[in-house]
């Protein structure tokens, strides 16, 4: 029987209590990712340690946030043995709907074989005032559900 397996990508870059991704059989369930750079993650860690207000990403250029979000998503997928082209479905949250065109122009450059099914919506205020957050469901190439063989219900 398939079981839930955390993807070994380290702790959440924000220190929040969640796994960046978990695998169930060949499926990956990827938590919402945003443009957290190592420097921004360090600032979050320092703020939490000192009791200071958490930093905001609002001052970072939107295009930069999108590129960093996609790189973070790539890193998590790679840690599980997958790539962006393995994404089956993505949900994109934008702080401002006016950024949709710029988001789409950048997003499309990260895929080589197909575009995943996708929902894009305006979400109002996102964590750390980021302009974009993306969650995804993907698959790991070469993996099958445990117990799935010829004639089994899972292989049909």
PLM regions with names:
Residues 1-71, 75-89, 94-156:
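N-terminal presequence-like segments and the immediate start of the first folded domain
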């Amino acid at each position: 029987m398939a079981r839930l397996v955390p993807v070994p990508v380290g702790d959440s870059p924000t220190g929040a209590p969640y796994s960046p991704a978990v695998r169930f059989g060949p499926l990956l369930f990827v938590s919402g990712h945003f443009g957290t750079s190592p420097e921004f993650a360090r600032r979050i860690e320092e703020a939490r340690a000192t009791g200071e207000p958490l930093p905001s990403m609002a001052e970072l250029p939107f295009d930069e946030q999108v590129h960093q979000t996609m790189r973070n998503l790539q890193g998590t997928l790679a840690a599980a043995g997958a790539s962006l082209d393995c994404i089956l479905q993505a949900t994109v949250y934008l702080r401002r709907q006016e950024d949709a065109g710029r988001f789409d122009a950048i997003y499309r450059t990260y895929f080589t074989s197909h575009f995943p099914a996708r929902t894009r919506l305006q979400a109002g205020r996102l964590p750390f005032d980021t302009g974009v957050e993306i969650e995804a469901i993907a698959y790991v190439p070469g993996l099958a559900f445990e117990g799935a063989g010829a004639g089994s219900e899972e292989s049909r």
